[in-house]
């Protein structure tokens, strides 16, 4: 029976060699490499809308994108026989440092790598998915930092709305609506953001898609699939925006504040002070340092803590037993969703096909580091970078959903 060993069990010389695929045929290398990429592709939702850039020639550690400016309108009539002054083109550059990512699995000597093995194939499949998720998350976290943000208003009774100005004020009543979709699309149009064959794209979480599908104007993807090539994960269209669904769409939500409790409570009345006593949970010293908390509906940064006191960056006034919530998400610590509305060319990534590889080290390839030929390994590594190129070509709509009380940060 084959056994799967812990990742770090054999950490040492055997896992730091750089010789690649020793002992594997060229056909097997190609096969496993193709398998890795095929399993990575479905996870690369955020990467599929990026402007791709080849890895720098000569193995440089930074990648560079050029941004070209626009020309002013040429409104001056031409004079017969006179050549006018031409217009120069402004070019700016955006650079990003490349980073390498990777993972591997060590397996027992029961694995025979002289032919394509089901165990190796299964591990390669899993690592392909892991690679896709990893590199897609790197891209997602970069492009979630855009400056164009719309906060979903609170939807009240009878169609009333209350504006929201901060992420930490969003609730499960702040859903993504048809009106918000139209507003985001209009903002992109006003910035002359290029489209993807006449449509903008939005990447959303299934929890948000659940709410949006209730809109009568929603058009499911199967209704136009015959005439349009669908994006990976595409589920439908609304107001000229094609929606792509993924569980990797960004969720903002703070972790529990205590080892045994999500929230804490204020211990004793606080009058305009930065030090707040608390109880209601077990917290290690400085475990909350650098995090955000909500006290009385306002957000504060924790600069330090003991097992019974928080030191905040700003003085606070609070009543005894007021609840202290995690402050990285919405109101009362609920989940907030970052829905990315994108125009073409808004951001760039490096070409993944050039910088990724699967590495299979057969049993017996580690020399004296594995004297009994007991171990083999399967892994991947990849070089990646992502950058926002045109901030005005993307809008992030932050909203709640019917699942804001249960979804976790990702």
Predicted regions and their residues:
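Exposed beta-strand and adjacent loop surfaces of beta-rich binding modules
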Residues: 62, 199, 290-292
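N-terminal "assembly arms/tails" that initiate or stabilize quaternary assembly
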Residues: 2-97, 394
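Intrinsically disordered, low-complexity linker/loop segments enriched in Gly/Pro
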Residues: 129, 140-141, 147-194
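Solvent-exposed, flexible loop/coil residues
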Residues: 49, 53, 59, 72, ...
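A short, polar/proline- and glycine-enriched secondary-structure boundary/capping micro-motif
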Residues: 76-77, 87, 117, 319-325
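Residue-level signature for short turns and capping positions that connect secondary-structure elements
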Residues: 70, 110, 315-317
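Long, contiguous amphipathic alpha-helices that act as assembly "spine/axial" helices in icosahedral shell
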Residues: 65, 91-155, 192-208, 370-383
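Sequence/fold signature of self-assembling virion shell proteins
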Residues: 11-49, 162-187, 207-410
């Amino acid at each position: 029976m084959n056994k799967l060993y812990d990742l770090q069990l054999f950490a040492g010389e055997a896992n730091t060699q750089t010789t690649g695929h020793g002992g594997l045929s060229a056909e097997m290398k190609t096969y496993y490499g193709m398998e890795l990429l095929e399993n990575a592709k479905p996870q690369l939702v955020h990467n599929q809308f990026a402007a791709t850039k080849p890895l720098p020639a000569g193995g440089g550690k930074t990648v560079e994108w050029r941004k070209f400016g626009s020309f002013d309108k040429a409104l001056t009539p031409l004079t017969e026989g006179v050549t006018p002054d031409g217009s120069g083109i402004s070019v700016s550059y955006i650079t990003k440092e490349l980073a390498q990512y990777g993972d591997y699995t060590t397996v027992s000597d029961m694995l025979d790598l002289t032919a394509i093995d089901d165990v190796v194939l299964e591990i390669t499949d899993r690592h392909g998915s892991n690679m896709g998720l990893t590199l897609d998350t790197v891209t997602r976290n970069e492009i979630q930092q855009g400056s164009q943000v719309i906060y979903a208003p609170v939807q009240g009774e009878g169609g009333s709305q209350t504006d929201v100005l901060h992420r930490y004020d969003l609730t499960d009543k702040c859903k993504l609506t048809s009106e918000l979709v139209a507003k985001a699309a209009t903002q992109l149009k006003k910035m002359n953001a290029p489209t993807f064959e006449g449509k903008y794209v939005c990447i959303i979480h299934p929890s948000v898609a659940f709410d949006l599908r209730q809109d009568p104007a929603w058009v499911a993807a199967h209704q136009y699939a015959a005439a349009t090539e669908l994006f990976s994960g595409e589920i439908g269209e609304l107001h000229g925006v094609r929606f792509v669904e993924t569980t990797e769409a960004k969720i903002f939500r703070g972790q529990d504040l205590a080892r045994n409790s999500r929230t804490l409570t204020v211990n004793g009345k606080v009058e305009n002070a930065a030090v707040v006593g608390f109880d209601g949970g077990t917290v290690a010293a400085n475990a909350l340092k650098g995090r955000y908390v909500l006290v009385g509906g306002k957000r504060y940064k924790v600069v330090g803590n003991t097992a019974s006191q928080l030191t905040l960056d700003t003085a606070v006034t609070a009543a005894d037993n007021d609840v202290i919530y995690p402050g990285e998400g919405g109101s009362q610590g609920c989940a907030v969703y970052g829905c990315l509305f994108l125009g073409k060319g808004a951001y760039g990534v490096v070409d993944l096909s050039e910088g990724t590889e699967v590495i299979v080290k057969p049993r017996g390839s580690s020399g004296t580091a594995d004297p009994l030929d007991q171990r083999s390994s399967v892994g991947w590594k990849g070089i990646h970078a992502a950058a926002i190129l045109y901030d005005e070509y993307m809008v992030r709509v932050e909203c709640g959903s019917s699942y804001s009380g249960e979804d976790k940060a990702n």
